[in-house]
Structure formats: C-alpha cells, structure tokens
Amino acid sequence: TTLFKEEDIHFWNKKEFGKGYQNDLAAVVAPVPLQIASPNKAATFVPLAENKTYQPGDPVSTIGYPTDSSSPELKKPIVAGQLYKADGVVKSVDNYDDKGSKGITYHMTSVSGLSGAGIINGDGKVVGVHQHGTIENGIPDKDRFGGGIVLSPEQVKWVKDIIAKYGVKGWYQGDNGKRYYFTPEGEMFRNKTAVIGENQYSFDEN
C-alpha cells in the first residue's frame, strides 16, 4: 500500500476547489514511480494532449479503477482492483470559462470510483479528467453517461510543469537497491538495450 502525504497533492485552485467543475482538479505526485509500484512493473503512461475543440460524436474513453458494481447491464464486468476501460462518444460540450476550460458529457459506462480517471480522445491522448456521471445500479449501459473537464491551455501547462518538476528522469534507485532508468518521456526501459551518454546498457524484464 502506498500512502500519499498532503504535500503530494497539488490543487489547481484550492481556494475555490468546491466552486464548479472547472476548479475540481488536482494532481497527485506518487512517492515512487508508478511503473515500479505496478503489478509486474508493467504500467505505462498515456501522453497528454494539447487543448482542442471536441464535437458531439467524437470518440472518448476513460481508464481507471472503479469500485465493484453489481449492475447486470454493464457491457463488461467490473472486478475491484483491476483496470477498467470504458469507451463512448461525446454527447455535449459546454464552456466553463473564457480561458478554454470546457466541460463535456459522454455516453459511456460510468460507475462509482471512476472519478479522477483520465478522459482519453480518439488519438489515445489524455484531454481531461472524469468527474461525474451515472453511479446507480440497474440502469442499462446505453443510458449511462459520464462527464468531466477538458483541460484549458493554462491547465495543460500546469500539468506539464508538475511533470517536468517531479517526474523521474534518468537513474532511479529503489526496490531493494535495484536501479531503473527512465527516459525524459517517463518510459522505464525493460527488455532492451540503449545508449545512455557514451555507454550502452542492457535492461532485463525487471
């Protein structure tokens, strides 16, 4: 179990956190790289998209760890603690402010525990954060919906700045003294060779 400290949580607008979905945004810096903490060290990251306009009908997905749901109408069963991906399409788009922050709703499986999951566009990039939607059991999957925030240009920069400041790059020592190498993009090298500086290294599956 990994415990977060208060200083690991970075609020977009802590003072007005509860005033509107446009302020319901925070980033958490993990105490250890998630690739190392994940099962089989297999975690990967989805790239961050630049701000753009979305239209009804555009494909979107969410990926997260929802709590168990007993609703028999869901397309795929939800198993507590296992990654769950839901696919859907944009239903509507609303402007939150004049800085490019938008709210979108989408036809999609939405259950309790998905809040905080990334909203992923058709290009496979994170555009925002899932915030709300259908959580009741017994509602057919076709009638379930979700909604969240599409990051404004300013919010995209804010996230990038956090990654640049806290993201692991280069050699990381942990996990009983083992050393791991992370590229500037956040990839952890496994099962490959790479030239770093003037030396060639070989990385095993660990």
Model regions: which residues?
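A structural micro-motif recognizing beta-strand termini
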Residues: 28-35, 49-51, 107-110
